[in-house]
Amino acid sequence: MITFPCAKINLGLNIVSKRKDGYHNLETVFYPIPLTDALEIKLMGDEFPSDVPCDLKITGNAVDCDEQNNLVVKAYNLLAADFRIPRIHAHLVKRIPSQAGLGGGSADAAFMIRLLDERFRLNIGNAEMEKYAAKLGADCAYFISADPEDGDTACYAEGIGEELMPVSGPGDNLRGYHLVVVKRDDIAVSTKEAYAAITPQAPAKCCRDIVRQPIETWKEELVNDFEAPIFKMHPELAEIKQKLYKLGAVYAAMSGSGSAIFGIFKHKPANVEEQFEGMFCKIMKL
């Protein structure tokens, strides 16, 4: 059985306060996009035995961890502690760039939970699956319901990203637009340093309300608080954002804590890959 974990972009990201546990409260809108990995599972037979209950093989983009520390295996182990799940082989094909703010690892974990639930008829239910996913990462829970073909599965998130509420507006606003995602492979963003450089404060207007407005208003109001400190550390990322605007984007921003930058275009831009030669550059229709 195979599934296709999807990436997300953040439409606005505001760091509103620091918590007593050291984490930060945030406000953001998660929006699913049709950039996917591929994840397949098969029952482990006698002809291909393994010493581990979830034997994971990763191909495609490089991932900076060994297979048994991957979130896909952790998702299996989490459910296997509560349910009788057979030993399996899993194959993950990575196409979503890592350390990009696109949620690729979180999506893989959540879609593994979804896949195990469907394949082995665990009947967990979305609400419980979200609770399991949240144990693996702050934004993992979102991907339990995310559908890259349905912008209405966008969610407004609070807390550390695990408190989810449906949000109306962005699905209708973005339908038919084109998305360009750009990432430089030579830039790794330190989220810890980025948080350290931010002074938390509540925004003048919540991103949940801004995304309901016409997209033409987003440029002046929809803000990712991480951009200021991270662009200061890596001015090349600010240059990518400005280039997307020069190419005709109606809105451009960094996703999450970076380092991917995206631009939203009313019409498909021409020759955009040539403008970002040597970088990951993907164009997709929303």
Predicted regions located by residue number:
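Residue-level signal for inorganic ion chemistry
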Residues: 11, 39-41, 72, 105, ...
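Short, basic/glycine-rich phosphate-binding loops at helix/coil junctions
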Residues: 47-65, 112, 134, 214-223
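Glycine/serine-rich anion-binding loops at beta->alpha junctions
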Residues: 91-120, 138, 250-262
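ATP-dependent small-molecule kinase catalytic core of the GHMP/sugar-kinase superfamily
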Residues: 2-5, 12-14, 18-25, 122-250, ...
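Short, hydrophobic beta-strand segments that form beta-sheet elements in well-ordered domains
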Residues: 73, 261-265
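Short, solvent-exposed beta-strand edge segments and adjacent coil->beta transition regions
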Residues: 53, 177-179, 258
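ATP-binding N-lobe of GHMP and related small-molecule kinases
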Residues: 1-100, 117-127, 154, 172
